[in-house]
Structure formats: C-alpha cells, structure tokens
A protein has these predicted regions:
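Class I Rossmann-like S-adenosyl-L-methionine
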Residues: 240, 253, 290-292
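N-terminal export/assembly leaders
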Residues: 250-257
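Catalytic cores of RNA-modifying enzymes
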Residues: 4, 8-228, 248, 265, ...
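Primarily a LysM-type cell-wall glycan-binding module
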Residues: 233
Length: 292
C-alpha cells in the first residue's frame, strides 16, 4: 500500500508538472496558436508519419512540444521550425535532445533545401490555422523534396484538400495538391482538446506523393488557370476564362467546346490538364498572330 501511495504521489507530481508546462507559453492570437492538450491525440498524429518513407521529419509550429515528444522517440532525425521566440526558449529548456535542431524562423520564408542539406524529408505538425493553406502551397513548391506530409488542420481545409470533383468543397487546394499527392483524411478532432479551443473542428490528414513527375502541360499556366476559374466558381468556364485573354480574341469555336459549359468543381485533375493545354495552345496561336 505504501508503494501504491508513492506511485500515486508520483503520478500526481507528473500531472502537476504537465499542467505547469501547459501554462508555460501563452498562446498568441496573432500567430494562430491553439496548443493541443490531449496526449493521446498527439501520439496518434505523430504515428501518422510511420506510413511515410523512412526519412527525416520536419515539424512546423511545435509550440510546447506536445507532438515533438513523440516524434523524437522515433528512429528518425527530427527538426522543428518555430517562429515564436517564447516557444523556442521553452523547447530548448524542455527538449535538450533536440539541441541545435530547433529552428527559430518563419517557415514560409525559408529555403527548404537547407533544412536537411538538400535531402528529402517528411513534413508534419499541428499547423497554425491561419497559414495552413500557405504552408501547403509552399509544400507544392518543394514537392520533390517532400514525398509525404501529415498533420492537423481545420476540418474545413482538410475536407477541401480531400474532396473529389462534384463536391462543393472541391477547389484550388483540391486540384493543385491532388495533381501531385494522394490524400487520406485520417480522423476528426474536437475543439475541446486545445488551449484555447478553436471555433471549428480539426482533422488529421496524410498526403503522399503520387507517381506523377510531369503533368503533361505548362505547370505555371495550370496553376494560374485553376486559381482563375475557382475564384469565379459559380460561373461557367467560358465566362471565367475570358480574363485570361486581355486584348486578345480567341477563335470563334474556342468557347463552344463542351468543357466550356461546365463549372470548375466538375473537372478532374486530368481534365484541368487537358484544359490547360487547350488554353495554352490558343494563347500561343494568338501571341504568334500578334507578333506577325
């Protein structure tokens, strides 16, 4: 009984220590910080990297390390990027194993080729809600460096990324990410496991690079076209595409193609590739006429 009592006191001391740690860094609204407080969910998120290639891991926005503590137990090198100087100081104090692997910078401004000396890595984190889309656009810029990405984001954004054509949530992120990655919606997370609780539910997803190495179209035009038509998603393509031809008049039958009567959420990634080639060919023809 005395032994059990000592165990109980030790458990209580550990619990109090965790509570003190939870209060060590105050969440900052301007950084979109919502600290995860459920250790079980943190471990589940950390375990999502196990299905990724056996590569180093980069965690974005570790905060107070609730996810980090499980990542560093895995047989992979781990680095963490944190913009909040208070969190960086906390991590240095509480995770001495990370040593020089805590990077106190803005992820969105970083050259990701220098993180692991040009080697590929897995991206993960409890991503700041206000910049999650920007994080994934950055991931796409370094898609050959990041074969796998996991983590937690707003449920709404997760649904958009995982949505299929014909779904109302299908949009810019859906097309651009699914062009290069296979997407898995893993599980939903309630609001009450965060400090402070966000106003929306969250979700954990995993994105794994597919076998596509070349879209078969002009990638810059593809991205521009996708963003253009989804910014007017309720309009037919023949209407929204006109702004891509300033000062130019496409041939008479250009807008009568069957695809032009559809709305952007009805097109698959492959159909967007075909549309890009269709639009690109017309732009080249018109430019040649203009220069002749």
């Amino acid at each position: 009984r005395q032994f059990e009592s000592k165990l109980s006191l030790r458990s209580l001391a550990l619990s109090l220590q965790k509570i003190r740690h939870m209060k060590a860094v105050k969440p900052k609204k301007n950084l979109g910080q919502h600290f995860l407080t459920d250790l079980g969910i943190a471990k589940r998120i950390a375990d999502t990297v196990d299905a990724c290639p056996d590569l180093p891991v980069l965690e974005i926005g570790p905060g107070m390390g609730v996810l980090t503590q499980y990542l560093i137990e895995k047989p992979r090198p781990v680095k963490a990027v944190e913009i909040d100087s208070e969190s960086v100081a906390y991590l240095h104090e509480n995770f001495p194993r990370l040593k020089d692997n805590i990077i106190g910078e803005d992820f969105l401004r970083m050259d990701l080729t220098r993180i692991f000396d040009g080697r590929q890595f897995v991206l993960t984190g409890n991503y700041p809600y206000d910049i999650s889309s920007q994080i994934f656009f950055k991931m796409l810029d370094y898609k050959d460096l990041i074969p796998c990405c996991t983590g937690m984001i707003q449920r709404e954004v997760a649904l958009r990324i995982a949505s299929e054509p014909g779904n109302k949530a299908y949009g810019i992120l859906s097309v651009l990410i699914q062009a290069w990655y296979s997407v898995e919606y893993l599980f939903t997370v309630d609001e009450n496991v965060f400090n402070p609780p966000p106003k929306v539910k969250s979700a954990v997803i995993r994105m794994t690079r597919n076998e596509v190495t070349d879209l078969g179209c002009d990638e810059l035009l593809f991205k521009r076209l996708v963003k253009t038509v989804f910014n007017q998603r309720r309009k037919m393509l023949r209407v929204s595409l006109k702004q891509m031809f300033p000062g130019l008049t496409p041939r008479e039958d250009f807008y009568t193609a069957d695809v032009m009567t559809r709305r952007p959420e009805q097109l698959s990634v492959q159909e967007f590739v075909e549309l890009t080639n269709y639009v690109g060919a017309e732009l080249e023809r018109l430019q040649a006429e203009k220069n002749s």
